[in-house]
């Protein structure tokens, strides 16, 4: 998926001010098809990618690197095995997340999906009216969240920062035992060198992200850096890529980080929440 998005971004940048009709004609397809390719919604063959890049005046060595991306973009990602519980609009996020070298997230109501225990995930999935109630789909949804955690715990893990609203510590998902296990797991994950988890306390008052959750993903394709802001809503998501949108969400996250509790205070807040579980 990240190969598709990287190729899409490069082709869009390389086209510059040339008309989409002119570029599409070079490769022998419609403006609509080119538009889908440049948005990362469709893939093209390595041959078509070469034709476009030659027309754009891209150097030969760069052409070959990005033509290889066109081939890679056609290969299924590991997440496709969970497709029974993977909406099309979420597939792009999982693909980019799996290739990201830095992940920043704000979550106001729940523990972020990538940090959830299996039982906590299951309790949420079983309440999600968008996920079919068949056990296979429920298990796929839970397994997908667990598999995503390898991005934080496997080889070459991503740098991860999370700001979690204090209210998420008190929303009892799945009952007392599941809730306690989740909070204890949050403490454990917070000890990893590549993870920084901060709680935004109630006492911090007004903050910069009152509109809701978001995720910032930083990734690299063929030595070129990209960023993506992800904002989810019921039944879909927004994928924001412009410099202005990335800058805005980065500033919002930095403000939240500044307002959040320190590492020691965060640990204390989580332990307090554990003690209050009845």
Predicted regions and their residues:
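Interdomain hinge/linker segments and adjacent boundary elements that couple functional modules
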Residues: 2-13, 20-25, 39, 43-170, ...
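A short, flexible beta-alpha/helix-coil linker loop
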Residues: 31, 167-170, 236
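C-terminal regulatory/effector modules of DNA-binding transcriptional regulators
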Residues: 163, 175-278
